[in-house]
């Protein structure tokens, strides 16, 4: 594995800035070059999975959509099950749902009702922490299922959007780990 001190540098070097996407004035952080690089992608998933030794977990939850791309290999590396949290209407069968507010409107996420239960210790994985709205809804959803949130891990945090300040009070001491700060 890549030396721990060099991992943030490696990851940052594989993220491409795309100006004015998806709209003028936005600098989009494209992680597809990182995903295409097997050394960088392995370093990322190994680093996120390593937290299992510090904070025991039973399952990994990935938030739609890029949280699936990161969360599934983290679960495999950690020897845990992977649970997708999806936009409403995308999962068949019985689901639990959680509504949340967006800047302009609202949204809803779901999980299969049988996928989480009392005694589960869950790590939430996503690509980016921005305002924290989706992550907050996921925390509420996981707790409503009877499971415990034992951490939130993201590739990068957009600190200027205040997601950490929103989430830390409701994480009840569970760690919020961002490998890169933007």
From Swiss-Prot:
Q: Report the family membership.
A: Belongs to the purine/pyrimidine phosphoribosyltransferase family.
Q: Which residues form a coiled coil?
A: none
Q: Which CDD domains match?
A: PRTases_typeI
Major localisation: cytoplasm
Q: What is this protein called?
A: Adenine phosphoribosyltransferase
**Localization terms from the record:** Cytoplasm
Protein's job: Catalyzes a salvage reaction resulting in the formation of AMP, that is energically less costly than de novo synthesis.
Q: What is its EC number?
A: 2.4.2.7
Signal peptide range in chain numbering: none
Please name the GO terms of the biological process aspect recorded for this protein, alphabetically.
adenine salvage; AMP salvage; purine ribonucleoside salvage
């Amino acid at each position: 594995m890549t030396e721990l001190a060099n991992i943030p540098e490696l990851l940052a070097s594989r993220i491409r800035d795309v100006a004015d996407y998806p709209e003028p004035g936005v600098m989009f952080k494209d992680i597809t070059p990182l995903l295409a690089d097997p050394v960088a992608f392995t370093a990322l998933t190994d680093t996120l999975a390593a937290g299992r030794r510090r904070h025991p977990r039973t399952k990994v939850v990935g938030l739609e959509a890029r949280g699936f791309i990161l969360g599934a290999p983290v679960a495999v590396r950690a020897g845990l099950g992977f649970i997708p949290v999806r936009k409403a209407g995308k999962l068949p069968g019985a689901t639990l749902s959680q509504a949340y507010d967006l800047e302009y409107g609202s949204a809803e996420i779901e999980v299969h009702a049988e996928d989480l239960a009392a005694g589960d210790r869950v790590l939430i994985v996503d690509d980016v922490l921005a305002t924290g709205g989706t992550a907050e809804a996921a925390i509420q959803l996981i707790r409503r299922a009877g499971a415990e949130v034992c951490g939130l891990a993201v590739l990068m945090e957009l600190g200027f959007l205040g997601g950490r300040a929103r989430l830390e009070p409701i994480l009840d001491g569970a760690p919020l780990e961002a490998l890169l700060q933007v």
